[in-house]
């Protein structure tokens, strides 16, 4: 009897233990049409309240719950929901594909976005703009080329650097304070044709995320923002050919399986052909002129095992401008990324990356058989290791490290002209490193919090000569260092925090704080980014930039998430901002560090966006009220002055109207305060030469900027294996002369006085593009 009782008790204990045990369901979620990973998809348990998870950047999910039989619901905006029933008595792996909704594929009254319903309310992160190329396909742009950077410039807190310029400013920061990544590789110049296009071919892009505050701890190296651009992986089920033919540019994309359902590739190219039109010119010097750019995106991936996957991706872009074989100017980016994904356990995901990045430019002048050539470059080799660890359903841990070896070649001059000697600025070397840890935690159904810290270090090293300067910029000494010898080591702790207080399922209040250190600096004498800007490291003289930002936002959804209201305020303090002493020169200056001065800055503002996400009529209104100010001891008599990116008012209106299955209308309107600029206050003569006299830094304003663009997309009847449409757009419909530049010259009608000459780039610019896809 005692034995039976003991066995019975043992059986009850074992049964209780089984019920107390927890098991993990994990796997990957992919697109059922092309096999690409789906990021940020939701997996919830039907039988358990507030129990769920989301996929990471590679479509991996992990959910740990007590043993039992459950219904798992898989959701993603733009896809049909899928449910599966699983008896969970052990750890299991379940990979799944979601099928795009028929309404989405037929382009009916549903707006495709990467943001799920209420996701803007519940996520801990704030000030994140996310979209896919599909979201922007009808927005009218210059020359008819879809451009993710131009679209970002229509959102709050992001300001265009000017007409025909792909540079952008985020919350009062400089153009060089944005970390721009393409498949994890830094892009040091994101512009083509001096800024008329960005380097991102939308046919090769999967999704785009811009972080303005509460920046996750895995990102480091820039003071203001992170633009993370991910390339498409290619269709692993069938071959596709797509492309577009425009007035000045065309593009072509080929993708398909390497082995069906196991691996895929994508090759996407784009080229302008303005130089072909110049060949029709009657002027001989124009016939030989070259003016074009090209870019090529390549990517391949392969599943080695059910737990291991390899990626190889690259980007190669080049601009070429030459005039009559007398002057040539070339610049371009090259990047490469090798990645290894591994599902380490049911709860841990690993990504190991080796990244290469290079930017270089060169211009040459030919005269009388002699030639002069000037060039510069920056090159990175980067090793990254990231882990995602799903601790439980309330805590998701992310940690890792990266090490970057920078090589700076600031400038070299080679000449066959007898009057000019060859000259080279010494190369510079640095090792940048970062270690981070971050947890994304949910506390009940009322609070989401993401907190973490990043340690960043920067080792400025030899081989090279380190100079020292006094307070006035005069060189006082120099010391030579051998290979890999530390000249100066900088390091910082960078805390990151984002919190979302969920007031209801329709509204939330968010706060964020982040500190960012920046060790690389772009030196420019112009008012906007150009290919000849110089990248320099933090050294024993050049100080790292530091940015501390606090932000608060209120988010509200209306009418079943059809309308979305976002309001945010922010304050940013900027330390060790860089400017130039009066008369400083950047061109082939081996002692440029002596011409730099350091100060502080502050940026603050209010941002508002009201968006309609569903229905035939969609779009948004965004408005930013902001200031960006700087203060330097040696500039402007030590008084605070507006930064060149200081724009008080910035308004954008974007509207898209789906008339029917065949026609879609779109329009954008932009207005913003003119840039702060420095103009001469007077002039004087020295030995007969007129010299301008400057007083207040950035004490004047360019005229206010405004522009209306309209577009029409015609969708032709699709065939089973063929889709095509025609996009017609007009840039600057009412042909307003927006000022690009102001120069000064002597007034011939009134000698002794100076008059201002305004130069505009574009008035009315029509464009037409034919797009197609062969399945």
Task: Give residue spans per PLM region.
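Surface-exposed extracellular loop regions of Gram-negative outer-membrane beta-barrel proteins
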Residues: 360-361, 407-416, 459-473, 505-550, ...
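Signature of Gram-negative outer-membrane beta-barrel scaffolds
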Residues: 403-506, 519, 635-638
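Periplasm-facing N-terminal accessory domains of Gram-negative outer-membrane beta-barrel systems
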Residues: 20-109, 446
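C-terminal beta-signal and adjacent terminal beta-strands/loops
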Residues: 662, 671-688, 705-709, 713-775
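Gram-negative outer-membrane beta-barrel transporters
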Residues: 570-573, 592-681
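A beta-strand signature from Gram-negative outer-membrane beta-barrel systems
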Residues: 96, 154-155, 199-242, 251-253, ...
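Periplasmic N-terminal accessory/gating domains of Gram-negative outer-membrane beta-barrel systems
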Residues: 90, 109-176, 182-215, 232
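Outer membrane beta-barrel strand-and-loop segments of large Gram-negative receptors
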Residues: 380-384, 424, 432-434, 537-543, ...
